């Protein structure tokens, strides 16, 4: 049973052909789903190449109850953003890295991925179709969610016979509502990943297990949860949806991407930027003791970008860190976002511009 698409009959927000922007209160954007006009869909059989995808009206999809994603969690997702610059361009931040990461994840889960070229082209098409939903400069970004899911029917544990590559978008503001730093709780009871598992790829199955810890932490007033390694329970690894860094003196340290944490694209970029401005960067095991003795702590990720950590609580010990205008994380945030927003020259070659010369006449009607 091949998946089918059902366009939404009642979109929450609207976009008209003659509007530069969709009807959204940009100043009130948070990090919640705002459905846009279109999505991208492509399909392929196991071991074959993906078909040329289509831009279709955003809507529900129907798949077999025996689909691999539903029964065995055979699915991957990515997350990246499109930005609108002051001079009107729309750009993507390092989409080639997301394409490569999806390839790595697909190999781990025995899935057939789109080629890196098709991935990037599909992202461009999807953003172009939804260009009115890219927020004005400084008002947020268009979050892009590529999905690779096993939609073919399987009964026993096996690779799905068919896959769907789908991309949808949503305009977003800040991931965390509070303007101050994060208040993290170290979870000493649950583990996010273990060696030999799937912690190093963006598998759909990695995320629902952290929700219990996250709910418990937020009910106690914390912003998020920091998980420890499964082998010793003594080293820090990853926050629920982002990587973590510590600063002491001139040394910036972050846990290594050795298979149990996600190799974040923002993480990779921050390591490079920190070295550029004269800091030593160490990717190594970091103990809880080192965390508690750090001068600064911050998190990185597509959703959070760079976010300072104000406090960490481990058992009954609570440590406060440097935040604010003088913080190293604030400096890094400005450097990175200036590149992303086109405020400064992109000497890294990280930004990819979307061609505005292509119109939207070929996109299907939403009705």
Swiss-Prot record:
Entry GO MF terms: branched-chain-amino-acid transaminase activity
Cofactor(s) annotated in UniProt: pyridoxal 5'-phosphate
Keyword Transport: no
Superkingdom of origin organism: Eukaryota
Keywords per UniProt: Aminotransferase, Pyridoxal phosphate, Transferase
One Pfam family recorded for the sequence: Aminotran_4
Transmembrane domains' residue ranges: none
GO biological process, alphabetically ordered: branched-chain amino acid metabolic process
Modified residues (N6-(pyridoxal phosphate)lysine): 202
Stretches assigned to coiled coil: none
Family, similarity comment: Belongs to the class-IV pyridoxal-phosphate-dependent aminotransferase family.
PANTHER family, A to Z: AMINO ACID AMINOTRANSFERASE, BRANCHED-CHAIN-AMINO-ACID AMINOTRANSFERASE 7-RELATED
This protein's name: Putative branched-chain-amino-acid aminotransferase 7
